[in-house]
Amino acid sequence: ILLDVPERGYKVKRIVVYPYQRFSLQYHKKRTEHWSIVSGTGTITINDKEYDVSVGSNWVILPKAIHRATAGGTDDLVFIETQIGNCDEDDIIRLEDDYGRVETK
């Protein structure tokens, strides 16, 4: 976490996705995320559409948009994530996860 200002509703993180790894397929109910790619290449999925990403790419993920980031090649995919809105961890709804973090009800 680079910056966390909960009373103002924003948080800034440096996110690293290791080569050939991916994040959970997830969405948020109450936050918008801005992703700025600073290193590496990969793909992001937003609402069933895949996009190639590289250094300089910028993306906006709106509330309820289903999304994930995947690193490609042999380098880490690194991006700066700015969260606006409800930045609590309980606003992460995981649909698929390679690490067993999907909650079933």
Feature locations, PLM:
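Short acidic-glycine-tyrosine-enriched beta hairpin
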Residues: 47-66
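Structural motif
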Residues: 22, 34, 41-43, 50, ...
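Short, conserved beta-strand element in jelly-roll/cupin
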Residues: 15-18, 27-44, 82-85
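A short, N-terminal "cap"/entry segment at the start of jelly-roll beta-barrel domains
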Residues: 1-12, 22-25, 92-105
